[in-house]
């Protein structure tokens, strides 16, 4: 049997001095633990008492750390779990208990987190459902919770609206720098990279009602022709050079008819 000989408050914890224990002469406990066990100077403790106190204290400190961590912004249960593990709360059962208590008190709510995250992305107009899902998965949220939240919040109409605005932005950026075909391909690719399906991306693209700017297309073709011709003239000539240039321009999205027309009037560099 041992006892407490002194209790001193430190910056964050209390130092509890002990006597009568072979392996412990002092321990550091949270205020929650001090209050929970009514600890005071001269209180007698046996080995079982000490083990129970230390076990509870790790839980109490874990809860305190978790409350501190979530005080700045919403966190997922997975983020809280990782944070506790990184801060020397190594008992998984106690971490589970902390998570369960905070969840029961609605201080951790993965469903609400997913819903707020999705609504934020929709408001920002920055991502499609697939990209949102992948980001939430990295935060440790159950895919079933994510799918349900997306289904409830991010319907097809909202997806088309966000995709259309992103398509408009791409058009403003690249409209005069690309051919119509290149521009359409660019818009579709950008939208799919943002997490929209091909179907939604195509609807957004069609809604733009893009039209060919003949003057701009011609200028782009001749600019590209100059660059490609200069490159291939270093190693090729005659028919082979013409074929290489034609293929290169076709890969850039120019039609064979337009390429042939341009080449008829073009003089290759010597």
Curated annotation (Swiss-Prot):
Pfam families in the record: RecX_HTH1 (PF21982), RecX_HTH2 (PF02631), RecX_HTH3 (PF21981)
Primary subcellular site in the record, as a coarse category: cytoplasm
Gene3D superfamilies, per database record: Winged helix-like DNA-binding domain superfamily/Winged helix DNA-binding domain
InterPro entries from the UniProt entry: RecX_HTH_1st, RecX_HTH_2nd, RecX_HTH_3rd, Regulatory_RecX, WH-like_DNA-bd_sf
Similarity-based family: Belongs to the RecX family.
Protein's job: Modulates RecA activity.
Gene name as annotated: recX
Gene Ontology terms: cellular component: cytoplasm
Annotated PANTHER family: REGULATORY PROTEIN RECX FAMILY PROTEIN (PTHR33602:SF1)
Keywords: Cytoplasm
Subcellular localization(s) per the UniProt record: Cytoplasm
A biological process term (GO) from this entry: regulation of DNA repair
Protein's name according to its UniProt entry: Regulatory protein RecX
């Amino acid at each position: 049997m041992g006892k407490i000989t002194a209790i001193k408050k430190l910056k964050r914890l209390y130092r509890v001095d002990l006597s009568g224990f072979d392996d412990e002469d002092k321990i550091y406990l949270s205020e929650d633990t001090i209050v929970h066990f009514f600890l005071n100077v001269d209180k007698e403790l046996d080995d079982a008492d000490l083990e129970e106190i230390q076990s509870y204290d790790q839980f109490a400190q874990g809860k305190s750390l978790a409350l501190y961590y979530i005080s700045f912004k919403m966190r997922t249960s997975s983020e809280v779990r990782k944070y506790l593990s990184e801060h020397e709360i190594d008992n998984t059962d106690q971490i589970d208990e902390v998570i369960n208590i905070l969840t029961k008190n609605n201080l951790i709510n993965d469903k609400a987190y997913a819903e707020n995250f999705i609504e934020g992305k929709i408001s920002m107009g920055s991502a499609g459902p697939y990209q949102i899902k992948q980001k939430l998965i990295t935060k440790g949220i159950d895919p079933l919770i994510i799918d349900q939240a997306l289904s409830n919040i991010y319907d097809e109409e909202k997806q088309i609206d966000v995709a259309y605005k992103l398509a408009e932005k791409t058009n403003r950026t690249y409209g005069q720098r690309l051919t119509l075909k290149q521009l359409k391909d660019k818009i579709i690719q950008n939208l799919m990279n943002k997490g929209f399906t091909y179907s939604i991306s195509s609807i957004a693209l069609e809604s733009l009602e893009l039209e060919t700017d003949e003057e701009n297309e011609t200028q782009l073709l001749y600019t590209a022709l100059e660059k490609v011709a200069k490159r291939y003239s270093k190693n090729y000539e005659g028919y082979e050079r013409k074929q290489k240039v034609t293929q290169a321009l076709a890969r850039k999205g120019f039609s064979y008819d337009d390429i042939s027309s341009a080449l008829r009037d073009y003089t290759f560099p010597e």
